[in-house]
Structures are given as C-alpha cells and as structure tokens.
Amino acid sequence: KHNMNTEKLVLSLKETYNDVDIIKVNNFDISTINNYQKVGLASGIYWGKFSKNIEDLLNKILDSDIKNLFFIYTSGVGKVRYEKKLIKKLEEKNKICLGIFSCKGFDNYGPFKLIGGINKGKPNEKDTQNLIIFFKNIY
C-alpha cells in the first residue's frame, strides 16, 4: 500500500483553492482535457519515476492541445534527476512547464523498510504551506 504522501499534499490544495478540480488518474476522462487551460500531474516517485498510470496519462496529454502543465511529487530521497527528463519531454512536444513542486515523503519501501522507513511525518505542514505558495504563483 502506498503511503499517500502526494495525495495528502494535493488534497490540502483543495482547502485553499476549492474551485480546482482534483481527479484521481483512474477517474480522469482524457476526452475532457480541453476543458482545462492548465493541467497538473501529481505522483509519488517509484524507483526514480512517476507511477505508471501518471506516465501513461502524461503521454496522452502530450498528444493533446494542452500547453501548460505543472507537476507535484513526493519522494523518499528528495529531488530526483527525473525532472530533467520530464522537462525535455515537454519541450519536445512544445509544452510549457509552469513549475515542479517536490518535497520528501515518508518512504518505507525497499531497504528503508528494514529501518522502519525514512522521513517520518513528511510531508508536513511546512511542505503544505510551500505547496500553496508554489500553486499561487502558477494559478
């Protein structure tokens, strides 16, 4: 079971920006994509990349008319090299990356399971506040 780190962050946005649509990837209908001027994708990082569902949706969005995207992710190890690949992917499709927000999240996968996990209590209130500031700048 995932630790829901990223979901906790995203749901905190809804408290401040109640007009924002937050849709779980499995419930998103790609045919509605053009109803939006900007789209954000949020995921935990699993072995160095977004979840497969988010990757699949991103590839569909890259083939749509949507130009403006932003990303939110949590990771046990913090910032990942994945961002460079992600930005390159967007640039190749003439998309604009409005920003990428990341913070550490509780991680008890792989070797971290042996020590009871790392980053207990993350994301925390400070991370939530930083996300709201990030979002305000792109909203």
Locate each region found by the language model.
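Conserved SAM/SAH-binding loop
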Residues: 25-29
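FMN-binding flavodoxin-like domain, especially the glycine-rich phosphate-binding loop
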Residues: 5-23, 35-139
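Short conserved loop adjoining the S-adenosyl-L-methionine
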Residues: 31-33
